[in-house]
């Protein structure tokens, strides 16, 4: 089973959310709980770019994130649903993508616009660039810690109570 199939299975199990469509031939996906006119998410693949949108009242706003690399896209989609899945299954939240800082030695690449805090992606300490156009710095910070792993492996860690072995360092600590 690949990442997309497993994620669809997990989303259906958790909330009855159906994932319909495909990226074949510039297609798209719809993430929907089956409630007509309810807010939902959509993803599409157009002109070499994967984009993820939040939709409300039958309208789709600007993309929450865009990338030309499917693996990066899969990780970003997982960051979008990861903590909600953990809460649904009664597991503690992870601080990854919430309050985690960008990985040491990595940088966020800005668009260069002084009017907005938009990013083009992240760059690793050894110079590898992972494109991800977004204004969500928390998404990029979390991405820096997981992008070198398989999205399927990271998904399975989100589904473990201890988040191990890859994500356990980001388990929320109980307040003292």
Can you say where each PLM-predicted feature lies in the sequence?
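Short aromatic-glycine-(Arg/Gly/Cys) micro-motifs in beta-strand/loop hairpins
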Residues: 34-62, 176
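A short, compositionally biased
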Residues: 25, 45-50, 113-118
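Acidic, aromatic-enriched beta-alpha/helix-loop junctions
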Residues: 57-71, 145-149
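Short amphipathic beta-strand/extended segments with alternating polar/hydrophobic composition
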Residues: 39-45, 62-69, 123-138
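Intrinsically disordered, low-complexity, charge-dense segments enriched in Lys/Arg
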Residues: 103-176
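N-terminal "first-domain core" detector
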Residues: 1-44
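Surface-exposed beta-loop interaction hotspot
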Residues: 68-118, 122-125
């Amino acid at each position: 089973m690949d990442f997309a199939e497993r994620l669809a299975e997990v989303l259906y199990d958790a909330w009855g959310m159906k994932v319909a469509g495909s990226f074949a031939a510039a297609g798209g996906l719809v993430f929907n709980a089956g409630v007509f006119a309810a807010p939902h998410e959509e993803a599409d693949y157009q002109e070499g770019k994967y984009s993820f949108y939040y939709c409300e009242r039958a309208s789709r706003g600007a993309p929450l994130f865009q990338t030309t690399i499917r693996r990066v896209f899969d990780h970003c989609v997982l960051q979008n649903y990861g903590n909600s899945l953990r809460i649904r299954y009664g597991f503690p939240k992870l601080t990854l993508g919430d309050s985690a800082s960008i990985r040491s030695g990595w940088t966020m690449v800005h668009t260069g616009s002084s009017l907005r805090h938009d990013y083009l992606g992240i760059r690793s300490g050894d110079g590898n660039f992972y494109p991800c156009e977004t204004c969500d710095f928390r998404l990029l910070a979390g991405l820096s810690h997981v992008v070198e792993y398989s999205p399927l492996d990271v998904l399975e860690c989100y589904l473990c109570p201890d988040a191990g072995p890859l994500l356990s360092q980001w388990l929320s600590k109980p307040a003292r």
